[in-house]
Design a protein with these regions (language model features):
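Class I SAM-dependent methyltransferase core
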Residues: 13
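A short glycine-rich, Lys/Arg-flanked "PGG" loop and its adjoining helix->strand segment in the class I
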Residues: 101-115
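Class I S-adenosyl-L-methionine
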Residues: 131-178
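Conserved beta-strand signature within the Rossmann-like core of class I S-adenosyl-L-methionine
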Residues: 115-123
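Glycine-rich SAM-binding Motif I of class I
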Residues: 19-23
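S-adenosyl-L-methionine
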Residues: 48-76
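Short alpha-helix immediately C-terminal to the canonical SAM-binding loop
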Residues: 44-46, 129
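Conserved SAM/SAH-binding beta-strand->alpha-helix loop
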Residues: 40
């Protein structure tokens, strides 16, 4: 409420990369507040420049780790939704522990969502989609949802384009807080 006092709908964009999808959504949905969280400094700078160019006032950016943001900066029942578009799949077996969409993460973000709040994920890495679906299955008392068709409102990101050029199948998933 402190950073978005006049917006009724609040969406957190986790790992917005270079920010192209966030900027497009901010322009297309000016009545929605977007909180972008990113650790990659060049992406933060690129999104700032994009937002200035479109004169957007409905985005706030945190250059921080999302776990720290959730633990230290987000109030409970403060988010209407979370977007996680093309997270790093951490493909190597020894790196799987770094994946974001674990049952522990899903439990951590759950109280920050309003009743009926959602998490929308898109990935072009089938093993990561399977991993995410298994993680949600492990916390089925908290969320309900599944794989969905790509929504028309979701912009195609640079990472998605790269995946499509490699003939990767893009999977969208949407889960609603119970």
């Amino acid at each position: 409420d402190e950073i978005f006092p006049t917006y009724k709908t609040r969406i957190m964009e986790i790992g917005f990369g270079m920010g192209e999808a966030t900027a497009i959504l901010a322009k297309e949905f000016p009545e929605t507040a977007f909180l972008g969280v990113e650790v990659h400094r060049p992406g933060v700078g690129k999104l700032c420049a994009s937002l200035e160019a479109i004169e957007s006032a409905n985005v706030r950016i945190l250059h921080n780790d999302v776990i720290d943001v959730i633990n230290e900066q987000l109030a409970d029942n403060s988010l209407d939704g979370v977007h996680i578009f093309f997270p790093d799949p951490w493909q190597k077996k020894r790196h799987i522990k770094r994946r974001l969409l674990t049952p522990e993460f899903l439990k951590l973000i759950h109280p920050k969502l309003k009743v009926g709040g959602f998490i929308h994920i898109a990935t072009d890495w089938v093993p990561y989609a399977e991993f995410a679906l298994k993680s949600f299955a492990q916390v089925s008392a908290l969320y309900e949802g599944s794989e969905v068709e790509r929504p028309s409102w979701r912009p195609i990101t640079r990472f998605e384009g790269q995946g499509l050029n490699k003939d990767h199948r893009v999977t969208d998933m949407r889960f609603i807080m119970k």
